[in-house]
Amino acid sequence: MAKFMCTHTLPAGKFSSEQLRQFAQAAQQDATVKGYRSFANLAEGRAVCVMEAQNKDEVAAWFQKMGMPFDTITKVELEGERGNIHAA
């Protein structure tokens, strides 16, 4: 599966940490997409996550099914950590 970097603008006060936890857990149970990593700042209404799926359309369909707003879904070509960059 490919990795997709997703950005979200969350309506202020609409999402709690528990709701985001439920989204993350649901992504682990789905047959089409898998959650890989998430970052969020609820006070500023911003979140970024990395999802694994066969294609961008599967990720978009999953977000729509779950009622999770999203701004962008971008296929990850390179990833890195602590100065090491490699193909995704």
Language model regions located:
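Short S/T/G/P-rich N-terminal loop/turn motif that feeds into the first structured element of a domain
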Residues: 1-32, 41-45, 56, 78-88
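An amphipathic, aromatic/His-enriched active-site/gating alpha helix that lines ligand/cofactor pockets
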Residues: 30-33, 54-79
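Hydrophobic/aromatic beta-strand elements that line small-molecule binding cavities or substrate pockets
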Residues: 37-38
